[in-house]
């Protein structure tokens, strides 16, 4: 009878330990919510000059229509045309 009680106490203790560690991990993940003003250092910073260059010289087609007039330079090097602007994708 004592061994059964001891096994039950140990099982409850292990369950409590696992539950506590899982709750702490979940709480830590909730604390790391990204706010709109936060910047993510893992994301590459966008070069302002490259954006302006691509805005004025984008010639990638979107839905069959060019973003910028023909004869202009195309956005290259991973830049794509979105909403009539060249963006780094």
From Swiss-Prot:
SUPFAM superfamilies: omega toxin-like
Propeptide: 24-50
Transmembrane intervals: none
Family matches, as Pfam families: Toxin_20 (PF08089)
Tissue: Expressed by the venom gland.
Domain of life: Eukaryota
Endpoints of the signal sequence: 1-23
The protein, known as: Omega-theraphotoxin-Ba1c
Native source organism of the sequence: Brachypelma albiceps (Mexican golden redrump tarantula)
């Amino acid at each position: 009878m004592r061994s059964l009680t001891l096994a039950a106490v140990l099982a409850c203790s292990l369950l409590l330990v696992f539950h506590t560690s899982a709750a702490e991990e979940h709480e830590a993940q909730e604390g790391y919510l990204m706010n709109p003003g936060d910047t993510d250092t893992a994301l590459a910073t966008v070069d302002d000059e490259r954006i302006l260059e691509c805005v004025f010289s984008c010639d990638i087609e979107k839905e069959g229509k060019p973003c910028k007039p023909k004869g202009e330079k195309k956005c290259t090097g991973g830049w794509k045309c979105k909403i009539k602007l060249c963006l780094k994708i």
